[in-house]
């Protein structure tokens, strides 16, 4: 896509945060980020990603994994008190419905509240890391704490621990 002149690439996982091969979304984002770095093209392409991003803490994790921006789909639907229907495993099998009578001003305020609270969470995490600009967070893998890695480090060598990605 980059060879064809794409300036934005939208990476999409299922709504549980899994790629087509079952890989977790943060691994997929990191892989795309690293490929672009290896090609010397990272600064020419915007990585936009979605899938499994449902909590305020998921946005900074997605950015640490290499994204420039995160797509929000289900959180917006639910902020409007909408309902999802179908399988969340397959994007083409899920749909959403909004309340029949939704006041425009109310919906606008709900979206502002959602974005504001997620912004506050991002600023809190940036502050805790001593970072003032969200762009500095992109691809900072060394700052991330991945549960799988932490468990392996803590429990490796203990009889009965099934870790190691098992």
Task: Go through the PLM ranges and name each one.
Residues 1-108:
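Glycine-rich phosphate/ribose-binding loops and adjacent secondary-structure elements
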Residues 106-166:
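C-terminal extensions of enzymes
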């Amino acid at each position: 896509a980059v060879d064809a002149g794409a300036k934005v690439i939208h990476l999409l996982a299922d709504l549980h945060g899994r790629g087509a091969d079952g890989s977790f979304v943060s691994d997929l984002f990191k892989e795309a980020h690293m490929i672009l770095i290896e090609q010397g093209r990272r600064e020419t392409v915007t990585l936009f990603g979605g899938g499994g991003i449902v909590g305020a803490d998921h946005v900074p994790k997605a950015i640490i994994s290499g994204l420039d921006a995160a797509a929000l789909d289900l959180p917006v639907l639910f902020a409007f008190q909408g309902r999802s229907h179908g399988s969340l495993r397959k994007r083409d099998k899920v749909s959403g419905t909004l309340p029949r009578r939704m006041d425009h001003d109310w919906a606008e305020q709900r979206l502002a509240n959602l974005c504001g609270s997620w912004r506050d969470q991002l600023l809190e995490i940036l502050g805790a890391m001593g970072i003032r600009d969200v762009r500095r967070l992109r691809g900072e893998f060394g700052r991330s704490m991945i549960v799988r890695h932490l468990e392996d480090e803590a429990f490796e060598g203990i009889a009965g621990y099934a870790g190691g990605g098992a």
